[in-house]
């Protein structure tokens, strides 16, 4: 089993598989076509000794609540780490939700204005409606309309500010000026992603410890405090998500553990599936996976 275990899920041909793996050997411990915690617990207990389960000291896992139950039930001596990449993905998804919300509002407004404009007499159109349509389709200083700006800003919201190109910096300034909720959500996400960076001392990474965890937890609470009552729903969602999982998130600083090996294993599985032209027979597919990856 090893002292560290990774729990992740993989979608294959529309079916969800739970994969329990050993990051030290990059081998699969269990791969089963279910997400139900009770079935996963039963299968692992049926095939692995209690001594091996008790020897596990760390479990890195997906954010799904069923995996929390699996980890607590099977590995009582292990601390849990919410995978860093899943946490960051959840945060970025909420930032993108703000962008999508604004875009949907503008599309609705444009549709309603165009419908109202068509109903106006051609010789005496309503100047207010025409002006609003004109403003909506007006080009900004970078050549984008507001709708194009929202559409083309998807990529820059995934990046940190120091990673933006010159055109992305200009687009970001326009985006944040016109859509303040996106600015708030993005700034919040950047602060959280910087919080996740390993602290350095004299050019080297500080050794993970319980003291470091407590310091980082205090810093995280300071970051999210002002956002718990934000008027932006997506920002509140991020803050409450962090509060709900703060223990598992901060446990990252006990050993800098992530699910990176599980994600790499998923990619190897995907390549294996592609090389073998998909998975037509599930039982035979699982047998071949066991031969190659366990």
Residue positions per predicted region:
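Nucleic-acid-processing active sites and adjacent nucleic-acid-binding tracks
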Residues: 26-47, 53
């Amino acid at each position: 089993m090893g002292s560290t275990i990774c729990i992740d899920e993989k979608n294959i041909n529309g079916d969800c598989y739970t994969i329990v793996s050993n990051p030290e050997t990059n081998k699969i411990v269990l791969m089963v076509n279910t997400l139900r915690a009770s079935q996963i617990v039963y299968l692992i207990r049926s095939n692995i000794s209690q001594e091996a389960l008790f020897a596990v000291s760390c479990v890195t896992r997906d954010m799904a609540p069923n995996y929390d139950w699996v980890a607590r039930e099977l590995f009582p001596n292990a601390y849990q780490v919410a995978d860093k990449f899943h946490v960051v993905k959840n945060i970025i998804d909420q930032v993108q939700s703000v962008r999508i919300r604004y875009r949907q509002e503008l599309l609705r407004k444009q549709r309603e204005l165009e419908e109202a404009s068509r109903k106006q007499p051609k010789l005496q159109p309503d100047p207010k409606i025409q002006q609003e349509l004109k403003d909506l389709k007006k080009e900004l200083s970078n050549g984008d309309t507001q709708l194009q700006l929202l559409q083309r800003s998807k990529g820059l919201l995934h990046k940190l500010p120091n990673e933006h190109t010159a055109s992305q910096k200009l687009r970001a300034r326009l985006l944040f000026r016109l859509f303040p909720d996106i600015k708030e959500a993005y700034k919040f996400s950047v602060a959280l992603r910087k919080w996740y960076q390993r602290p350095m001392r004299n050019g080297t990474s500080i050794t993970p410890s319980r003291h470091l965890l407590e310091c980082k937890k205090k810093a995280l609470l300071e970051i999210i405090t002002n956002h718990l009552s934000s008027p932006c729903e997506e920002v509140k969602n991020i803050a409450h998500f962090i509060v709900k999982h703060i223990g598992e998130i901060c446990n990252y600083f006990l050993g800098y553990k992530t699910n990176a090996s599980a994600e790499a294993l998923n990619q190897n599985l995907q390549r294996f599936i592609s090389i073998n032209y998909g998975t037509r027979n599930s039982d035979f597919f699982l047998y071949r996976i066991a031969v190659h990856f366990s």
